[in-house]
Amino acid sequence: MTSVRDFPKIKAIRSFIIGGVGSGGDYHNVKGGHWLIDSDISTPASKWDQYKKSRTSWGINVLGSFLVEIEATDGTVGFATGFGGPPACWLVHEHFERFLIGADPRNTNLLFEQMYRASMFYGRKGLPIAIISVIDLALWDLLGKVRNEPVYRLIGGATKERLDFYCTGPEPTAAKSMGFWGAKVPLPFCPDDGHEGLRKNVEFLRKHRESVGPDFPIMVDCYMSLNVTYTIELVKACLDLNINWWEECLSPDDTDGFALIKRAHPTVKFTTGEHEYSRYGFRKLVEGRNLDIIQPDVMWLGGLTELLKVAALAAAYDIPVVPHASGPYSYHFQISQPNTPFQEYLANSPDGRSVLPVFGDLFTDEPIPTNGFLTTADLDKPGFGLTINPAARHKLIPSDYLFKMPQVGSLPPPNPSEESEETSKPNGTLDSLAAKVESLTTSTTS
């Protein structure tokens, strides 16, 4: 009889930069003209005129996508995608790989803690923990495949048979016609646009309310671009529009500000969390009781392992969790939890008026909502149920082709006479790397 301790160990870690546009975990790595980057959308950079027209002008898509593969000793491979591009791949191998090789992939809590604590001196939030998130998701995908179970069955099983979606996009009428539960629209103007901008925001939302009728849920995404005074005034001006919730009105770090806007409008729903990280960050949001919903992104906050802790914390305060985007990675979480009433679908078509896979053409079998919902049967495949599209394989640039650098600890003492012509030039190594990425990326889009 096989011992319960006989379980495949982690044998190898591989990472890939995803070349081109329109594939992988960076939602904003799309072609020009896409509503998500080139619509009128208020952002933290909208206060400067040169950064208003397109979100790419201030670099929202600068990192790009990457993919991590984790291979077990029995040959099983789990994988996941996220945002981070070349810097993410570098950290996967130069820092985080040491905690993974030879480890038991079932020890997701231990592996998260080791990676999180070891990167605390430069991480905790942002890109480092987003990289940990993708590694964690690849571990869960591996576990599901080894056990021949969908991930949601590994984390408690189904609490519902159907996942209802709302759609984030430019046209609520399109979301309604496609069968979605509700629609979320990005706010077009910021406080620096003055009273005229505020008036235009109200007119914009009134137009959409009239287009879908009085009862179809409309949510507003403010994308961290407002301040307390402006938010209070805008919400007051829109009280008759029956806005379901106001999302990310303030900087993620302005927890006191959320208390002030909730005090000003106690019966209005406010949400945030898309740009928060780890259970420690969400503890502040939950314990303040100034938010009606939290919206973690499983590809950013620390992965599924950390999201489960955040969900338990929120449940103790009776606060619903509505995950931000993340495609199937969120779907398995959402269907397993009792305090997750619905899920976001981020419209991935250029005009936002049709339903396409969240991760573009990277996978052949990504489940997408039909008539605004999915069922548990749509998720009943091992792991996260995804298969890398053979036609997209050429976009996966192995990171070991780009990063052939010795470990820092093994570098010999400097010897100027042995420096190559390339590396002795200013930024020679970085320039060479950039040229390789550019040439490979260009070749995938031609």
Where are these regions (language model features)?
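Flexible C-terminal active-site loop/helix
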Residues: 5-25, 29-53, 327-446
